[in-house]
């Protein structure tokens, strides 16, 4: 489905995408969930089933039914990490200018699209010399770096990274660069 170009809003950046990261695990999971029927979705997300039951108890069956139908009919865009050119900048955004290359993050913002609106706090300027494809990994790099920081290990410590998907592989590279074994 073609979507209209989003409007520029205060506090954000309108970006013409030039590269978007395809995350095989996340995108496949979203597509897989979308292809399931109601029962399959309920089995896959028992936490949401509990929420629906709680909502039915407090707001009634009809209101809950309508809320569930609205939620299930929403289109969930794929993607959450891209790079592109700033083609519009909110008046209150001062560190990004039209024409700057930016890397963007955020489910629901930095999806697989030709143009996206992204809040400023989810955008960063791309350094000169960094290619588009590498810059599109900004979100995964940030997730990996956050995990390393949360582990709070001393330089040279021995660390174990469990799971070597995209984030795990980037985490290993960050740990090696930080002198971890």
Residue ranges and their predicted role:
Residues 78, 118, 138-139:
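Conserved SAM-binding loop and adjacent beta-strand
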Residues 106-120:
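A structural motif shared across PLP-dependent enzymes of the aminotransferase-like
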Residues 134-181:
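Mid-domain Rossmann-like dinucleotide-binding core that forms the NAD(H)/NADP(H) cofactor-binding site
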Residues 2-4, 117, 125:
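Generic structural detector for well-ordered beta-strands
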Residues 6-22, 30-105:
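Glycine-rich beta-strand-centered segment in the early N-terminal region that forms part
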Residues 19, 100-101, 115, 158, ...:
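Residue-level marker of beta-strand positions
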Residues 67, 121-132:
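Glycine/charged-rich beta-loop-alpha catalytic/anionic-binding loops adjacent to active sites
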